[in-house]
Swiss-Prot record:
Domain HTH araC/xylS-type: 139-236
Biological function: Depending on the conditions (growth phase and medium), acts as a positive or negative regulator of gadA and gadBC. Repression occurs directly or via the repression of the expression of gadX. Activation occurs directly by the binding of GadW to the gadA and gadBC promoters.
PROSITE patterns: HTH_ARAC_FAMILY_1, HTH_ARAC_FAMILY_2
A molecular function GO annotation: sequence-specific DNA binding
Name listed for the protein in its UniProt record: HTH-type transcriptional regulator GadW
DNA-binding region: 156-177, 203-226
Keyword Transcription regulation in annotation: yes
Keyword hit for Transit peptide: no
Keywords: Activator, DNA-binding, Repressor, Transcription, Transcription regulation
Amino acid sequence: MTHVCSVILIRRSFDIYHEQQKISLHNESILLLEKNLADDFAFCSPDTRRLDIDELTVCHYLQNIRQLPRNLGLHSKDRLLINQSPPMPLVTAIFDSFNESGVNSPILSNMLYLSCLSMFSHKKELIPLLFNSISTVSGKVERLISFDIAKRWYLRDIAERMYTSESLIKKKLQDENTCFSKILLASRMSMARRLLELRQIPLHTIAEKCGYSSTSYFINTFRQYYGVTPHQFAQHSPGTFS
């Protein structure tokens, strides 16, 4: 999968120019840049080390964020974030691990990439930068819904958060051969599946967490989507169901 952003480790202090401003980069600082910006700078390899992060990893990071403030600042156009004092032993270990053949399983690699992103979690601009790196409108809609699956979502809520119109979102989703209702349903059913697979949670609680006020309606929707009831599904999953 093509990368959408990059983490750069600075190994020698130098200056760059971004949007007509000089930015001083200090030794042992790290940068997070969107793909095009990272490619444009063409950092000299002796002075930097670089990790490219793909869209799936970005989505995994955003998926674990719940109940964000209503104003996410998604209109922000920041394309570069700097952490001047990251935990260098951890940073070095992460970068070194990708140079060791046979060490990085997909699961471990994903954890290391997520650790890199988390080093910018204190920056309020992180979520907008990652969100805007997602290439499709359907992907962005899915991520917004994932921030609060239990919410009673309407298309106008998505349009408000994306600072655009409902009609434009509809058109772009049609161009991607999907629609808002399909994305909402898929997001809720994916959450239901994860809860049934991983935890022992009462059915009415699972329904509520997935945005359904009626447990019977949730059961019917789940059966139509997966072809089995939640109880039947849970019987074949590692967890138990009550």
